[in-house]
Amino acid sequence: MSTLRKLFGIKKSKGTPPTYEETLATAPVLMDTHDTHSHSLQWMRYHVELDVKLDTPLKTMSDLLGLLKNWDVDYKGSRNKRRFYRLIMFRCALELKHVSGTYSVDGSALYSNKVQGSCYVPHRFGQMPPFKREIEVFRYPVHQHGYNGMVDLRMSICDLNGEKIGLNLLKECQVAHPNHFQKYLEEVGLEAACSATGEWILDWTFPMPVDVVPRVPSLFMGD
């Protein structure tokens, strides 16, 4: 650098700021616009009830998630809630239990679970508008992967109005199935990125439209 100063006749005086040539660039040449360190926290209270009645018993968790993935085909509500609804449904499905005594003569089975609580969700969807408490019901037939039956889903989420109580909901899901967490998340139609600190953050690869200003023993232990 001193050679450049001599070449261009630049004198460095005490107390003056360094010339541009003497400073190191602080911004990378190629900036990572998908920085998992930049995220928001959605604090919310949630409630979800899930009942699945099928003509044949479920074999794997992947089979179940495949039946639930398209729950929102006819969804007309807030688009911002969509991913959060999908996440609480996922949380409920991870601990879905067979209802004792509901195997019928024809081999059909009923599975059920209810989960509720307060939590926070790290996400990269930007600022979310207020979530108002309302119960939304989704009921649809399933005919896929060799299963026939009916899914009943009742969900609600709402803001905590400034309170910050509850655990990381993504972490709860990860603890329930640590070996298959990311695989199951993708199978239900969600994405998550792991930050440098090991925290899972609800993420997206392709942006979706948004509204203007969204350990109990498992049924499938071996899956």
UniProtKB/Swiss-Prot annotation:
SUPFAM superfamilies: VSV matrix protein. Its main location: virion. InterPro entries: Vesiculo_matrix, VSV_matrix_sf. A motif (PPXY motif) lies at residues 17-20. It is found in: Virion membrane; Host endomembrane system; Host nucleus membrane. Plays a major role in assembly and budding of virion, by recruiting cellular partners of the ESCRT complexes that play a key role in releasing the budding particle from the host membrane. Condensates the ribonucleocapsid core during virus assembly. This is Matrix protein. It comes from Spring viremia of carp virus (Rhabdovirus carpia).
